[in-house]
Structures are given as C-alpha cells and as structure tokens.
C-alpha cells in the first residue's frame, strides 16, 4: 500500500498528533485517535505502522467508542431495571467486526478519510481482520444476527457463549481432500474483547452429593475451575444501545498447581488441573467418538450454563431497588433465559441447584421459578442432533444434576399417570430418562420440553413437523407451549454492508434508507421491477459484485472464472441431507453432455460457474468424500479445453462469514436442495434471496415461506414434499424405486475413473440398494434427481432472457422483507420473553 507520496505506509505521519478521544466522529479526530493507539497501546514495535498495526489501532479507536456506549447502556439498564433476556448459545459466528461496527455507528466516511490520511484504504485494513472462530454454521450465525437485532431494537438482552481459542477448524484443501488445522484467530489477540477480571465464577465437575443433617443436599469435592468473562460489545444500528456478548474462558486457580510435584519434576501431574481447565475452551465441538470426547463436550455445555446463570443471578441481586435481597418469585419477571438448541439444556438442573442448594428454596418454589424463566428453541428434527447423554457419564460428571433430573422426570411421569391415562403407553417415549438397560440415556430435548414455558421451531414447516410428529404427545398435554418463530437475518451485514452498490440503488428507488431497519419497505421495489432504468442499475451492481467475486476466487483457488457466466452457488455445512452430492452429480451429468456435444451445440448452452463451499465434520467420512469429489470434478472440468469455456467447478475453501459476504452479493442462482422435512429453516437462503439471487430448492425449511413471499414464478421448485418422504422411503425398501437414466449415467461416469483414481464406491454405495446401514439412498437423491435436472434446465432457459431474469431478481429482493431478524426478535420479545425496548437516552 502506498501513501500520497507513493511510498509504502510503514510509519506514522508526524503531522498527525496522537490524541485519545472516544467520541471522535470527524476524520481528523479519528486519525488522531488511531495514532494514539498505535503509539500508546503497545502491542507492536513503535517503529512500524504496517497494515496489521493499522488494523489493531483502528479497532481500538472504535472499541473506545463502543466501551463508552456499552457503559451508558449498562448503567441505563441498571437504573431502569427492565426484564432482560439472556441468550445461551454454544456457537456465535460473528464475522469481521470492524466494518460492522463502523457501519452500525454510521462512521464509514470519516473512518475511510482518516485512514487515507494515514496512508491506507479502509477496505485494505478491514481485510487484515480474522473472523472470530466461535461457531460453525447456521446455528452460530443466527445467534449473531439475533444479537445485532436485539441491540438495534434497543432490547435489554445479552448473549452468553464460550471463548474458543481454535474454533471448529480451518479447512484446507489438498490432493487428499479436506484437511483440518486449528483456527488461529487469537494467535495475537482480539482487539474487540474486554477481559473482566472482576467477573469470575467457580464451576465444579465430578465430586459427590453431601446430605446435611437437615436433609438439604450439597455438591462437594471434585474439580473446580474458574470462569473468567470476556465481553465483546455489540452495537445496534443507528442507536446508542450497545449490548454484550459475554464469552467465558476456563482457568485453574494458582493454588491448583502442585508446587511439590512440580519441583520433583512431575510437571504434567503437578499442572493437571490447569491442563484440564485449558481443554474446555480449546475447540468447538471436540470429537465425541471417545468417552473423553463426550466428557469434554458435556463439560463445555455445563461450563457455559453454570457460569452464565451465576452471572445472571448476580445481576438480578445487583439491580435490586429494595433494601436487602429480592424475592425469588420476582426472578421470572426480571429474567428470561433462551436456550439456543439443546446444548444449554443443563441450565435447567443448574438453575434448580443454584436456587435450592445455594439459596435455600424448596423444590416447588425452585421449579416454579425455573419453569417460568427458561424457553427452548428447537433447530432440528435429525435424530442424531437431538442430544442424548449417557446416564453413567452424567452421574460421573454432574451427580447433583442427575438427582435433580431424576426428580423432574419422576414428577412429570406421575403427573401423566394422574391426569392422562390415555398416554400411559407413551410414557417410555415421553419421559426424560430412557432407562433401556443396554444404553440408559438422558434425552435433552425431552428435558427442555418438559421444563420450558415455551418451545419454538424456526420455520412454519419445521414447527408444524415438531407439533405433528416429534413432540405430538407433548402438544396434547401443553397445546399453548409450542410456537413458530421463523428465522431471520440482519439486513445490515447481509445487504447494507456487504453489497453497498445494491443498497444505494434500493435507497435511491425507495427514496429512503429506512428499509435498513424496516425491511418490509422493500416491497416498494415491486412496482419498479419492469423499469428498464432500475434493471440497468441492478445489472451493473450485480456485475460489479460478480467481478469482485471472480477476483477473489482466482486469488484463493487459482481458478479463473468468467464473470459473464451464470454464478451458481451452494454454500453450507457439508451433510448428506443438504445434498451437495446431488448438486455435483448434476454437474457431472452436465459435463458429460457438454463433452458429447459438437462445438456449435456448446455455443448455444448457458455458460455456468458452479461454486460449492462448506466444512465437513472431521469424523464425517461421507461428507469428506463429497468435498473430495467436488474438487476432483473441478480439476478435470476446469482443465478440459473443450468444456471449460462453458462450465467451471470451484470448491471454495474455509467457508465462513467473510467468505459468505463475498459470495452472496455475486450470486445469481443459489441451491437449497435438502431432502424435504429435514432442514429446520436455513438462513443462507434468506441472505441469497435478499441479494436478488434466485433459488432452486425443495419445499423445505424457510424455502416454503421464501417462495410464498417472492412469488412461485420466481423460485425454481423441484422434489418430493415432506409428507411424501416416508412413503417414498418405504417404497424404496420394498424395491419399487426405478432410477432415472440420467442419474445412472452420472454415477457410472464417476465410477469410470474419469475424475481420478480415488475410490468413490463407498460414497456412491449410499445411493444403491434398498435397505441396510449407509445404503438405500435415505436422502432421496435418486428420487429427486430427475425433477432437479428438469428445474436446472428451466434455470438455463430463464437466464437467456436477461430482462426476465433481472425482473425476477428484483422481485426476490422485494419479497425478502419478512426475513429480517428484526422481525424475528421483535416476535420473541413480545410472545416469548415478554420484554420491552429500553433505549439509552
């Protein structure tokens, strides 16, 4: 990077004086604040001011502002003492914070100008920031969108999570396929987090239950680690309100180091508690194939719940306006705890334990408080994702909590027997404890449903399936407990900041930028969908985004792609139910047909660039085989001189929020092709639709509602419906399935070895046969393949009509208003949490 004199900007300009000013909002003052941090926040040698130093100094100048706003918000919440929501999630997928904070504070211009005076462009400095590795997929990104909306809507709410040092993993692609290496986002430090040395809570593991003479019970002995709080400020858009994502780190105490053993040379033994504490926040979702892996995952979940609840209770007392401590009966009127999936389920027995054992409440009072405080969001109908923990493991790690869970279960079962004789034969499936002697487990979803005041699904279809199938008997007991809250995304990060050209066009045609916080205003674009001037501007914004994406793809993968081709993208966690395998088999068939065509025929086809990205869990063999297949197909297709003008295939490595912010604005077709009934909602479909990308998809998750909103004619639909899936699986078992010739042709082409010597037999075998483990095409790739290929042919035809395609694209954006996380969170606030806005004056 060169400064105005054409020299590399490696030192600070002497003419700008260093001055700390958290309230700086013009370019000169901001530049002074950046220089101040470069000089006096001594993370680096003072002799340099390279791009990395510029990032940290810029971030810290912003952090000053955020801390001031955070303090004002905290003081205001303490003064008003509103009911507050606490959002518990094992994952947050924040993405880069710099551009988001600058955008939410509306300081893009001043910061860009300030950095120019220091010899840098804002975009270049933003590129230096690493994504916080606190999540993996949609669950974590949803939590982050929700925090943005909570702050923007001025709601009294906080997030709680864990400070993972190495995240899930960083994905690298080699000749072997996907390989995993640790994330390094904290290798230096994060400029956004504020360590709170005064916020430390003890968290116990193992031990035993001590029965006191008065009959009360106490959990004692075992290991005790310290939970230390790190706060990440979350600014709202266009408001002073700045809330907190509080992340916990596990530490051992100084006295837990055995100096005698250490001085005897027994270093590992002397520091074993320090080592065990450090393991808790090392990675997200440690492998759980071993007993130790399961134990570590359970430790993570309990650590999050215990530290967060102790903090929540501390704040409940801190805000007391009366003399002495508050009445516990007030707790549910001041505290709402939302469990994001089943990972934080241990909040239920832990809150019971804290109330009874530490604060002397009786069972009935503690249960009344707990069951009025906690609510549960279900995110899946996949059996493997409905957590079940071994009872023996739970007794070992959390003996007091198992006693409490047993008592909850006993009382629930007794209530059923007393009030619902008709459900007697369902008790074994309704109960929290599955006491099967072969494998006794605790069913966490059942514990959530029994104990929560509200249970919600995350899309209308998903919620309907929960009520009709998964939780049907519970619905007959508590019909009013179940709700739907269709997921949403923040329009700030997913349109305003990631596609500024398109946002400016929207603002120009709507004659207001209020759509950024009131996304329903996008419907105003419908009246202009046929307007040639808008279509021309829309196309130029799309082209700019496609060119930017093409440059990124070449830089990261070395593959040169044509920005005039149709950009077809599928990015999400690699899983068989999400059916990336169907996508790549469709590509294989397209490649084979292109190879068979004469050159004149090829010229009549629609050139297409297919991009696939996402991480496969390290132990999920078939998912990793799919990643390998995509890369092998890409290697062959992209180097084929006859075809590569008309088809390119790219695997985009290490998919994360920042990569998504590059891919989504440049997309034209996006694939959301899960087996119907298996995707709870999905949120990437909303991000693509908001950016004017057309969707090819099944009637699954939020696709159903997106299609309703954007118009059936603007959605490429295919595939079986959720209610047909069980019958189709049964027919497959009975040998009644007849595969489409195109499907067989694609599979045989892969088996022929044209894409290399790797043995794809085990992967393709999952699509063969009628029954058996890992066989029988459980996800209906074969059944849906012909309608998928027909829908892809319709895509090609539609893309040839440029005006028609642009109209569909505009209508896609115009129909995306419903899918703002502001709408979702406003519904949670009103219908589940019963909280109100608390704006900082």
Curated annotation (Swiss-Prot):
Keyword tags: Allosteric enzyme, Carbohydrate metabolism, Cytoplasm, Glycosyltransferase, Pyridoxal phosphate, Transferase
Entries under PROSITE patterns matching the protein: PHOSPHORYLASE
GO molecular function: 1,4-alpha-oligoglucan phosphorylase activity; glycogen phosphorylase activity; pyridoxal phosphate binding
Reaction catalysis annotation: [(1->4)-alpha-D-glucosyl](n) + phosphate = [(1->4)-alpha-D-glucosyl](n-1) + alpha-D-glucose 1-phosphate
N6-(pyridoxal phosphate)lysine: residues carrying this PTM: 687
Pfam family membership, one: Phosphorylase
The enzyme's E.C. designation: 2.4.1.1
Residue span of region Disordered: 1-24
Originating organism: Arabidopsis thaliana (Mouse-ear cress)
CDD domains: GT35_Glycogen_Phosphorylase
Physiological role: Phosphorylase is an important allosteric enzyme in carbohydrate metabolism. Enzymes from different sources differ in their regulatory mechanisms and in their natural substrates. However, all known phosphorylases share catalytic and structural properties.
Localisation per UniProt entry: Cytoplasm
Keyword hit for Transmembrane: no
Gene name of this polypeptide: PHS2
NCBIfam families noted in UniProt: P_ylase
Protein name according to UniProt: Alpha-glucan phosphorylase 2, cytosolic
Entry similarity comment: Belongs to the glycogen phosphorylase family.
Enzyme class: transferase
A single BP term in Gene Ontology: response to water deprivation
CC annotations in GO: chloroplast; cytosol
Entry-linked SUPFAM superfamilies: UDP-Glycosyltransferase/glycogen phosphorylase
Needed co-factor(s): pyridoxal 5'-phosphate
């Amino acid at each position: 990077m060169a400064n105005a004199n054409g020299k590399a900007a490696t030192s600070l300009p002497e003419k700008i004086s260093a001055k700390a000013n958290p309230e700086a909002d013009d370019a000169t003052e901001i530049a002074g604040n950046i220089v101040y941090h470069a000089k006096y926040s001594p993370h680096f040698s003072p002799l340099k001011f390279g791009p990395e130093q510029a990032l940290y100094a810029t971030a810290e100048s912003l952090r000053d502002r955020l801390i001031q706003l955070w303090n004002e918000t905290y003081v205001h919440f303490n003064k008003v003492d509103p009911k507050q929501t606490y959002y518990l999630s094992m994952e947050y997928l924040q993405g880069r914070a710099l551009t988001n904070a600058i955008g939410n504070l509306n300081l893009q211009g001043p910061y860009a100008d300030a950095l120019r005076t220091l010899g840098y462009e804002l975009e270049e400095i933003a590129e230096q920031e690493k994504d916080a590795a606190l999540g993996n997929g949609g669950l974590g990104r949803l939590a982050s969108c929700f925090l943005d909306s909570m702050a923007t809507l001025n709601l009294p709410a906080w997030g709680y999570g864990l400070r993972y040092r190495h995240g899930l993993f960083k994905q690298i692609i080699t000749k072997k396929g996907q390989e995993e290496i640790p994330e390094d986002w904290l290798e230096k430090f994060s400029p956004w987090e504020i360590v709170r040395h005064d916020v430390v809570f003890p968290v116990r593991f193992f031990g035993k239950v001590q029965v006191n003479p008065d009959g009360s019970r106490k959990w004692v002995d075992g290991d005790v680690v310290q939970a230390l709080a790190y706060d990440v400020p979350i600014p709202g858009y266009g408001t002073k309100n700045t809330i907190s994502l509080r992340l916990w780190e596990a530490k051992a105490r100084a006295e837990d180091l055995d100096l005698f053993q250490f001085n005897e040379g027994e270093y590992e033994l002397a520091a074993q508690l320090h080592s065990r504490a450090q393991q808790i926040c090392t990675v997200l979702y440690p492998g759980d194939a071993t007993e130790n892996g399961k134990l570590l995952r359970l430790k993570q979940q309990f650590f999050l719940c215990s530290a967060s609840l102790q903090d929540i209770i501390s704040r409940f007392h801190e805000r007391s306006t009366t003399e002495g401590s508050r009445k516990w009966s007030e707790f549910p009127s001041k505290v709402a705890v939302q469990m994001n999936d089943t990972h934080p389920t241990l909040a239920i027995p832990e809150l019971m334990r804290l109330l009874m054992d530490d604060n002397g409440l009786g069972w009935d009072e503690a249960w009344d408080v707990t069951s009025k405080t906690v609510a549960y969001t279900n995110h899946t109908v996949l059996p493997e994702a409905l957590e079940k923990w071994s009872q023996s493991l739970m007794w070992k790690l959390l003996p007091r909590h198992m006693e409490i869970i047993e008592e909850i279960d006993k009382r629930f079962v007794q209530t059923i027997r007393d009030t619902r004789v008709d459900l007697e034969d369902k008790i074994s499936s309704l109960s929290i404890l599955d006491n099967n002697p072969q494998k006794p487990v605790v069913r966490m979803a059942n514990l959530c449903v029994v104990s929560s005041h509200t249970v919600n699904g995350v899309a209308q279809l998903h919620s309907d399936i929960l009520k009709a199938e998964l939780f049907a008997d519970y619905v007959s007991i508590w019909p009013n407990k179940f709700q739907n809250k269709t997921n949403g995304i923040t329009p700030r990060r997913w349109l305003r900041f990631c596609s500024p050209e398109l946002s400016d066009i929207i603002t120009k045609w709507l004659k207001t930028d209020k759509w950024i916080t009131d996304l329903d205003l996008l419907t105003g674009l419908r009246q202009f969908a046929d307007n040639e001037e808008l279509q021309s501007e829309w196309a130029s914004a799309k082209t700019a985004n496609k060119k930017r994406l093409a440059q990124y793809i070449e830089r990261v993968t070395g593959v040169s792609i044509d920005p005039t081709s149709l950009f077809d993208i599928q990015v999400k966690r690699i899983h068989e139910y999400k059916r990336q395998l169907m996508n790549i088999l469709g590509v294989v068939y397209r490649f084979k047909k292109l190879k068979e065509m004469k050159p004149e025929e090829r010229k009549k086809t629609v050139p297409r660039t297919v991009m696939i990205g996402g991480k496969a869990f390290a132990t999920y063999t078939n998912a990793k085989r799919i990643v390998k297949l995509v890369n092998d197909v890409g290697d062959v297709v992209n180097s084929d001189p006859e075809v590569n003008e008309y088809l390119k295939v790219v695997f985009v490595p290490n998919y994360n929020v920042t990569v998504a912010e590059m891919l989504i604005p440049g997309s034209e077709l996006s694939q959301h092709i899960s087996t119907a009934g298996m995707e709870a909602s999905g949120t990437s479909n909303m991000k693509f639709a908001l950016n004017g990308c057309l969707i090819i998809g099944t009637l699954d998750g939020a696709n159903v509602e997106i299609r309703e909103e954007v118009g059936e004619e603007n959605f490429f639909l295919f595939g079986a419906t959720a209610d047909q899936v069980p019958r189709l699986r049964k027919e497959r078992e009975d040998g009644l399935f007849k595969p489409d010739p195109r499907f067989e042709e694609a599979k045989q082409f892969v088996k022929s070895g044209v894409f290399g010597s790797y043995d794809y037999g085990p992967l393709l075998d999952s699509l063969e046969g009628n029954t058996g483990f890992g066989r029988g095409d459980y996800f209906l790739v074969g059944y849906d393949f012909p309608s998928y290929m027909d829908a892809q042919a319709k895509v090609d035809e539609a893309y040839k009509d440029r005006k028609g395609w642009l109209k569909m694209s505009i209508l896609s954006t115009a129909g995306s208003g419903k899918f703002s996380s502001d709408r979702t969170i406003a519904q949670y606030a009103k219908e589940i949490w019963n909280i109100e806005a608390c704006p900082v004056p």
